[in-house]
Amino acid sequence: MLSVHFWQTPVRPTDAASSLANGIQTPTHRRCQTSNWTGQLSSRTLATIAARAAAPWLQTTSAASFGSPPTSLWLAEAPPQGLKNWAVVATVAVVPTALGPAQARGNLFQATLWPLRDQRGTQDSPSAHHCLILSLKPGQGLRMEGGTSDMNSQTSLTPAEDPVSRPQDSPEPRQQLRPLPEPSASTLPEAKYVETCASAGLRRESPQTLKLPPEQQASRSPKTKAQDEPSGHAPEAPAPGESPASSQCLPSQACENDFSSSSSSSSSLVDSAEDNGLSKMDDPTKLLGVLATSSSSLGFESDPETSCRQHREEAGDRAGAGEDKRGGVDDGIASCKDIIAKSHSKRGPLRNEDAHYITTHEIQLTEVEQGMDFDVGLASRWDFEDNNVIYSFVDYASFGGSDETPGDITTEEDDDNSCYVSTTPSTNTTRTPSPISSDLARPGAGSSGRDTSSTEVGSGPSDSDTVPPPTGPGTATPPEPLLELREAALGASATAASSCGSAASQILLSIKPTSRAINEPSNVRAKQNIIYAAKHEGDMSLRVSSAAEHNSSSLKQNSAAAVAQDHAKKFIAVPARLQTRCGAIRAKELVDYASGASSAVSELDDADKEVRNLTSRAFRSLAYPYFEALNISSRESSTTLSEVGFGRWSTFLDLKCGGVGARVEQSLLRSSAASVAAGLRKGGGTRATADQLYLQTKKSQTKALEFVVSKVEGEIKHVETPLCFQKQVQTGSRVVTLLEPLNLRSESKASSATGPCRITKGSSKGPGSVYTDDGSETSESSKPASRSDGPQKKSKFASSLLKNVISKKMQREHEFKMERGEVTDTSHRNPPSTKETEGPPGAEKPWERGLQRQSSRHSEASSEYTVVSVSDAGGEGSVVGSKSPIFKASTPRESHTGSGQNVSDGHTEVCEIKKSASETVKGIFLRSQNSAFRTWKEKEAEKLEEKAPVGRLKLRKGGDWRADLGEISASKSTIMSRLFVPNIQQTPKDKQPEKQATKYPAAAAQATSVAVIRPKAPEIKIRLGSVQQPSSDFNIAKLLTPKLASGSSSKLFKTIEDNSRTQQKLFRGGDNLEKVPQFQVRDVRDKSKASGPLHQVRDVRKLIKGSGDSSDKGSVTPEQGLTGPKPRQLTPASGGSRSLSPMVIMCQAVANPREEGVDREPREGVSQVSNGGRLLNSSPEGTVLVHRASGRLPVATIAPNKSEQGSYLPVLKIVSKASAQRTPEKPKEEEAKEEGKAPKPARNALEKLTAAVRSMEELYSFNRNEWKRKSDPLPMMADSHVLSLIASEEKEGVAGPEGGDPDKLAKQLGQVEERDTGHKGGVVLRAAPIERLQRRNSNPSTESVSARAAAFENMARERPRSLYIPPVHKDVERTQPLQPLPPLPGNRNVFTVSSSSTQKTGGVAGKFPQGPSPEGLSTAKGIKAQGLRSLKISPATRAPPEDASNRKTAVSLEKSNSDCENYLTIPLKGSAASAELLGRPGASRDGPPSSSAATLCSLPPLSARSQVPSNPKGSQVSGTSRPAWRTKPDNHRETVVAAPTGPQSPEHTPTAVYHQQALPFTLQGAQPQVLCFSPPGMPAPAPAGPAAVPTDPFQQPQPQQTQRKMLLDVTTGQYYLVDTPVQPMTRRLFDPETGQYVDVPMTSQQQPVAPMSLPVPPLALSPGAYGPTYMIYPGFLPTVLPPNALQPTPMAHTPGGSELSVATEPPSKETAAAFTEAPYFMASSQSPASSSSSAPAATPQLVGAKGFAQLHGKPVISITSQPLGPRIIAPPSFDGTTMSFVVEHR
């Protein structure tokens, strides 16, 4: 994501000036909102952007621009004074198809700050114009170039932009620009955009924009907007040849030639006409010039070479414009060449439109204290900007190998892709040299591209960056051309600016590839060496330039120093995504890339892809909270961390991000030696400091993960404090600090930051570094001593600060972590790796207790708690050992393995320091948690004892360690937990749940912390329980099941981690809901332990298990974990595994207070567990899973104890495991269903189903007979949904075939057999009952069974969460009943089945669906909706009438029950397709997903991974229930659970009317985040029954014509469900489930062909909350949705228009109203602002854009199909800190 917070100025300079400070003005001059740009991008502007192929460039005011090279960025004094012109050009280089969609995301963000006063006049003088160009290059990530536009540069630009400037500017630039015009193919889209802009009020822009060539397209949009202001600019645009460059090259150096000239002419024109406008236009133009370079590389029509030329020319212009502009030119040329090389590789395919991917760009602007940040430099404010505002430009897509993740061309490029734009005036000089040395050193480091990418574009006195930028960007990395250009421009700008003032001049948009180590040369001067972070190649170099860096700058003048410095300077403006990515990938990569030394490019490719996918998902949720925190903490950071400065804080985040960088983390884990090597090469091996930096980078990586966790859980405030610590500890400490503050260990942070570890780390870089990562790097021993004191003071300050922030942040983090499986998943992933790491060090366990307790503990202390180190050295060390340091678990494990002794020594040393820090932290931070901490210690000891008695030491070492890790969530989550929760986690792990609960409540801050901790504590407890089979439900379900059933320790660990994460998630949800409930959970746990009902549940479960679960147990690990281990848990639960039992009880009993949060989350956990039992993803759910399993299996038996939980317990069962799910639910359905299932199912599946059905039968009988009657609403619900569907389906005889089919499917999906069997066949049905129970959660009954039945039915009714997706194509009807009952779980399971091989798709499917339900359901209803979110896809092949009837039933159910709204019956196109979808979801998910249109729900928060089985035919998976992302689903998806269902299950791909509940969506706000694109080719006759997704029309319509794919937006990690014609040109989208790139056919033709009901949940369209979650591909959306397809009938069917039949044309006003209520995007002719019920228009737009805007006050982007080039497809969202927009690249 490219997040830029920029001010948008009005058309007139005066307006701009007025609006500058507070408001952001869209390039269209439409004053977004004076105050923050919070989601205030004008809808039109965004729409305009969407219309044009390029992302909008957001211009602040043309008034501001980079001054002459010496001039720093400063706001012009002209009327638009203080206005900056930001052109965000989303010119994404077209990535060759081979590269994959994620690779090419060249987004150019150009901030042109033109001093209105200039030589030529306020804006005229090119030199006076400072251009800040943020370029996102496919391989380079974000590059910010801030440079003055020289007259020459401007001349070139000006000719294109403004005739006035042209004469002034030299013609050469024009020529340079002329190459830019090559992209003129994109001109049309651009023209569209321009037109839009013009219509938006651009006065002369439209003509100009129209002129813009494709390359300019991206810039054009911004430019067009700018053009609004500049009349003079318009003339420029008309010059096609020049216009592109001109447009692209805003005054910023990026497009120096044209840009400058454009700026110049623009300036004059703008000054005369509209200062801002011209400037804006110029800026965009120039930016586009750069982008043209970049743009062509981005895949705009312009050729890569042209763009290269432009790039070079622009670079040359830049060089001319600024001191370094020449260097920039050279750089540009080199860069250009590289870019061309890379661009060609990726651009050609994109040109071919083979590469199609979605990138989400967030432009984040954070305010930084003017003075402090300056010194710090990282977050130094842009001078041109408000002094307080620092614009962090981050390409989340690029972060952490964001590009790599999607399989971008090269990791290097990916590295480039991740760029951190930071304004570090103070780092001015340093910055430039940094890029040089960085680039130089980096190339030496080995990933020259990456290294180059890391070159920071900074303007500084030292910015003789002519050489450095070229060296870094041009030379180092082909993917870095943009970066280099930017660097050249920035360098030139920096050079110019540096003269003017380091602060102002230092607009450092350091765009580093995520692969780059987070550059953590901390601002701390002492820690200049710590630039090691930057050294870490794998890490994104989040360079925080600061005074320290400035100091470093001198050191880094040499290439090595410069590299370190540069890296240090790389700041993470947008750490959130990186963090998430890192978290997701880090654990994963830790596992995957055990040997990757320094996150080599190759290693990082896959890992990065994964990371990007995972972190993208997590990031979506992460980013916004993070940004919020960022905003808060940015100022606080600035003041508090004034020394460090906001940059420092950013660096902190960056460190985290760096840690997040999969590569870095991977390398950390992979090999200490490699890490050292990477650090050396990154730091230019020249300096020991560099090594230390590198070590710190490792640390940074670890911290990054931690930070991700903390960021996710907590807010940036967390980071904020860490920043303080960072300040104190500086880079190394900062890295540790990142983790430490996250750990809420200010002292620990200080100690860690202190560098005891750091020095040791330097010594034992690999392990030590890793260790240090976790525990404040042992290598810091020497440094920290002195540092410790300062950090400790800061620590105290931060401690107090952290207390507040962390308690808050931890709560949030837990919520987020839990809600998005991401954090948990990351933990989960990391644990396997961790376990492996831990395994090798055989002494680790003893070490854990003894040495590790010291060293690991200390390492951990840094990560977890320094206090823990001291206090919990024994307890935690013994329990956690390697796992104790979550990150340590990942890194430290390696460190233990690799340099265990080293770490030992270092840690001993660190121990001392950490002790002092620990003491400080204890005194300060732990003051509130001290008792908890001690109790935790005690509990940990207890835990250890408990674990040992359980005889699960092995698990303890692996599992418990994992559990501990799990308690921390995983390397990432774990750290987060350790961050603050570790104590609590571990305390609860043992018996402290109540104790801790009591103690925590004692302290308010503690309570907050505890709230955060608590969720983890249960995890830990569960983990412990996991160690003991009965000890923890989740652990047993996850840990035990994998261990017992799978017997795979890694899987077991995963399970453990999943469990812990699930628990964490669960608790986090509880945190989110209530801290008390969490306490309650603990208490309940203990009580539950004693409570008979729990045992009963267990016993019942045992019985159930004995009857049918036994087979399940054997059959499926997850099920076994859920079902099999559960009975075991029963026995041991009361005894050794009390905490686990209580945990289960907690879930079940504590469901009351946390019904919403816990139940939902547990449910999510269950779902995740079912899927995640096998998959890491389900780890967070795993916890809930077991709970659910224990609660769910016994649901029928033990309804009373867990009535609330019972409601969701069934969900638990359903989601938790197909088997467990089946066990409780199936018994209900068993009789009816088993009959059908018995014949076909594999014995295991049959047995499982039978057992499940039997259990379910009990529930069902109760539901139908007893339960149903007990809760009046339930009978109807049960009948209408699960029961009714089951009965009707069974009656129809579908039950038999379907039952058989599900079993068959289960068989087919061997891995999902158990889960899927229940899932596909009975589980889906069971899920409904369980969901009913879940629904019951909202109104838990005294009697569990009746309550469960009632809740289940109620929930089913309330939340038709499960779209009716006939798991089996054959048994549509039966599936419908099934799905209605457990639609969500079932569907999830189906998804699991369908993506079970993919698996984390399955896991996500199972898990996220649950996650969303727990997370998002404010009520059981929400949970149900989420649970039911699975779409029921009835096979179209099946008798359409039957399907229609089924659908009708579903619809009627929906109708009857508003909650049912979520049920979306989606007839699958064909029985075969359905069978495929259902039968081979896993397979199809893995391999077929692309062929079968893997329909991952595009639920960023919800795990899009869980998707309905893709229909090989494509588009049969019309809807996928989109589980909430583990990242953000829980929190944001309370209601989304239901809503996502709707969008997730586009009815059949043909017309795929989503009857997504309008209500659920409305309720959930922007929850539903699945964007289903019906292939336009499927003009699918309006569904015959538009009301209920017309089964027949959708089923029968051309299933083969379209394929629905869940495509991952690697940039944002969002998933888009795209129905695409199979034949049309395909776009390559990354299918995270298969990890493959799917070519999604996208053609303009398609759009009109098949009207796609696109009820896009507001969430999808509410960028503020989720950012643009959904992106509607114009190609996907028919230009006009057929009225029948989009009839509002579904809405009528669904109560309250719950099912929005997204009929663009036919939707009546009420439909429109419904859409508005439930913000769905419909393809409609109306402009985004127009009412949702706009008449169908030729251009598909987001219907309900207006509604969306109304609901969320967020602009909706109207997306018009454009042939090629990037275009904004999702409404740009602005949360006040960041603006994010989804850019589609074709």
UniProtKB/Swiss-Prot annotation:
Keywords: Methylation, Phosphoprotein
Biased amino acid composition, Polar residues: 149-158, 248-259, 1131-1140, 1167-1180, 1336-1345, 1389-1401, 1504-1521
The species this protein was found in: Mus musculus (Mouse)
Record PTM Omega-N-methylarginine, positions in chain: 1767
Compositional bias annotation for Low complexity: 232-247, 422-438, 1105-1115
Protein name in the entry: Uncharacterized protein C4orf54 homolog
Residues that bear Phosphothreonine: 721
Biased composition (Basic and acidic residues): 306-329, 810-828, 845-861, 1153-1164, 1223-1238, 1301-1319
Modified residues (Phosphoserine): 1179
Region (Disordered): 140-191, 203-329, 400-480, 746-907, 1081-1180, 1218-1242, 1291-1348, 1362-1460, 1477-1550
Highest taxon in the source lineage: Eukaryota
Biased composition (Pro residues): 467-480
